[in-house]
């Protein structure tokens, strides 16, 4: 029997952060809700959006504390044809999305500090799991049927909770060269925390297999594969005396003709291999096939057993930042900021 294609693992994806990349949050100020174009800001939230523009502030200390609470639903639509369902809906909750900004202006100089969730910031709950979890189990019925074990359906209980937040703490200094041009240089420290919790339970299938599930009722997949491994081990052991006696090179038909095996034993040995059996196989090859089946079935029993994942990832990185603010007149202000690549470790 060939292995069923099972791969049950937590999908823990890590990737380098690129400044301005798709993972970077853009709503770093409550003012963003009213005005999406904040990249040339000269208000206190310029600490994040346009730090070189902080020189437009009046002399003295400036401070801002704001928070956003966000709720949404995310739907994943997967077209894999063997899935029972193709839509997976998750509840996304972000109860605490703060922005803390402070700046002190002294003539031409401005020293600033910012703290905010640079990426992520919330949790996602998928009560029915994710398609990447379910796809391996959805392939079991077709895989077993292809091996001569009629199977038409599966079921599985899945759940997944994930959270991700990349906290950014930024410091820097801005300098005003003249009324038109100012510049900024600073550094942001990123502290990343990702958590993943999930369950895979009650993987059930309905194989029709004599001696294990002749009626084709739903049963736990791990129980089916465990019993299949036991039967395969027994079949491999049953022909060992014949091999020890020098009959390993005989086919099953030849062994029957020679009186080493009964017609019933030949039928059981051939039938147990299903589509993997052909009449030219020797007794030794039949034994090897059953041994391989026993190993594969034991692995599949483990892969379809109840599983729980609880993982926490952490990382730290540093982002150099430079900026330029250009004001050719009172009506035009242009903010430029470049964030270097961040390597998380």
Language model: regions and residue ranges:
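Gram-negative bacterial Sec-dependent N-terminal signal peptides
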Residues: 1-19
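N-terminal, post-signal peptide beta-strand-biased segments of exported outer-membrane/organellar beta-barrel
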Residues: 15-126
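Extracellular/periplasm-exposed beta-strand and loop segments of Gram-negative cell-envelope proteins
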Residues: 33-36, 75-80, 84-93, 121-167, ...
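Membrane-embedded beta-strand positions in outer-membrane beta-barrel channels/transporters
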Residues: 48, 99, 170, 321-322
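Residue-level signature of outer-membrane beta-barrel architecture
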Residues: 55, 103-106, 171, 175, ...
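Outer-membrane beta-barrel channels and translocator barrels
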Residues: 58, 106-109, 178-180, 329-331
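Membrane-embedded beta-strand positions of outer-membrane beta-barrel proteins
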Residues: 63-67, 113, 173, 183-185, ...
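Outer-membrane beta-barrel pore domains and translocons
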Residues: 66-70, 116-118, 168, 188-190, ...
